[in-house]
Amino acid sequence: MSLDQRGDSAHSVAMTGQQDDFSHLDGIGRAMASVARSPRLTVSVVAGMGIALAWLLLGAIAVRGAVSRLPGTDAPGDTMLRYLPQLPLPDFLARFFALCLAPAPLHASLGAQGGALTAMWLLMAIATMLPSAAPMIRTYCEIADTARIKREPVAHPLVLVAGYLSVWLAASAMLAALTLAVDAFASPGQMLDPAVGIAGAAALSIAGLYQFSWLKEACLEKCRNPFSVLFANWSARPIRIFRLGMEQGLWCLGCCWALMLVMFAVGVMNVFWMALIGLFSLVEKQAAGNLPTRLAGAILLVWAATLLVVST
């Protein structure tokens, strides 16, 4: 009998024995045991907590950014954000926020500021993109659940999520480098302020034009139909599932990378636009047809032209 089979046998005995109610544990212990028995529930809890924590941290950064922004450089929603309380933060979070919001790496190296900005962009990806990846994660959990019923080995769904997020980590590093470049050459004020003039119009134009591209359509088709990709590439090996998660992350990045550029035109830490982009990504991946995508592209192009005319 293999190790996996012995583990399954022991698990079955435990589940059918007198200890399956975990009565010897306290309430928290029983709750944790219930979560641990269900990979699908585990993934839902971890993803939900990650998304909630990401939004909490992003909101705190946005409030501090709105308060510190110079007059005349307000981003949309700053007036409302200034009325929100600035909660006391641990020292390490205060330093992290300072690195994200500072106009230059004052008491830290450029690498430290780049690392902080990478973490900030990754938080944005978790907050806005992970919800739209829920159908893909749920589909994997359903296939994995069916395999477990048949006593087949399965890689944990969190391995798939880790592969997915690794792609966004790499993208976050590139967006952090772009943030530093925009701050050095095109920022009107502090770090993360909205880019104006040609820089802002260029970001909106690229995002708008990409909505009409064949690559956007191909990536969107893959994101809308995860079952065929997951089923065709199914494996019990964690490394294969990690790579599968990376593949799904690349399709998602192909759908949404251009929309991230919109954040440069409205202020990188604009939580209202973050929420709007996250909601649009969710709707776009669930909708049939290209109407939402093309409509968003047209709006972005008109916006870019208007910004360019107003700023000249």
Q: What are these model-derived regions, one by one?
A:
Residues 42-58, 163-175, 307:
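...captures the hydrophobic TM-helix bundle architecture rather than a specific catalytic motif
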